[in-house]
């Protein structure tokens, strides 16, 4: 799936009544033998079905963004400690483990390696864990958003990519990107009420930049909200908990 512009990204995520369901590979997929946030896992998932990938990253001691959901490596690797305790090269001594804690031959990838692998192949949904993780200071939260903005602006490391969706936790966060001139990504935002819908409807962000997240189930009580979103061409996203 080649996405060469924001217009092509928006077209891919435009709702229509006859549109097929698109399955998101959460953290790249979590099959036995395939760890989360791993290029090889994404490759395996993509070989099975058309999809896009929600991924997470944390920063190493030498400030390299690597694919890692947690701020520590304990749960998903054979090592222990915070991601920021190690340089990228030091992290390569550890192996990734699958969801059953089985060791795999795979290593922690850099974000830039994942982006290059996925270029012209798949869409990525970046989930900024620094925004909503407990124990992260307000200063670090702000700094993480500023980092995203710098990377997306002209000359930034992500500026050349047109296959990025940003998960944001609030309208205020979305507006920080929008008011900084970020126009080459879409935003995945929670719209689980009429009030949420009206807040975004009144914002300067056009609906063509929005994908609406509606939590873990389709709720008949929110049918009016779904209809309003669909009338604006907005696709909705929900989570299926295994």
Language model segments and positions:
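Phosphate-group recognition and catalysis centered on beta-loop-alpha active-site segments
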Residues: 1-242
């Amino acid at each position: 799936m080649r996405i060469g512009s924001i217009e092509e990204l928006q077209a891919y995520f435009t709702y229509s009544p006859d549109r097929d369901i698109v399955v998101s590979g959460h953290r790249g997929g979590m099959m036995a033998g395939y760890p989360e946030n791993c290029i090889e896992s994404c490759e395996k998932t993509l070989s099975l079905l058309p999809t896009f990938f929600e991924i997470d990253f944390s920063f190493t001691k030498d400030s390299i963004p690597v694919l890692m959901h947690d701020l520590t490596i304990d749960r998903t690797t054979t090592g222990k400690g915070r991601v920021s305790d190690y340089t990228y090269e030091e992290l390569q001594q550890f192996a990734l483990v699958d969801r059953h804690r089985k060791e795999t031959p795979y290593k922690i990838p850099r974000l830039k390696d994942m982006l290059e692998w996925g270029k012209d192949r798949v869409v990525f949904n970046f989930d900024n864990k620094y925004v909503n993780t407990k124990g992260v200071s307000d200063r670090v939260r702000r700094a993480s958003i500023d980092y995203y903005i710098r990377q997306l602006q002209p000359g930034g490391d992500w500026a050349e990519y047109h296959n990025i969706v940003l998960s944001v936790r609030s309208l205020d966060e979305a507006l920080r990107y929008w008011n900084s001139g970020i126009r080459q990504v879409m935003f995945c935002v929670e719209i689980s009420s009429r009030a949420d819908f009206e807040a975004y409807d009144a914002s300067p962000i056009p609906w063509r930049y929005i994908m609406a997240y509606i939590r873990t189930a389709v709720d008949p009580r929110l049918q009016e909200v779904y209809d309003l979103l669909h009338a604006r061409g907005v696709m909705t996203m929900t989570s299926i908990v295994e």
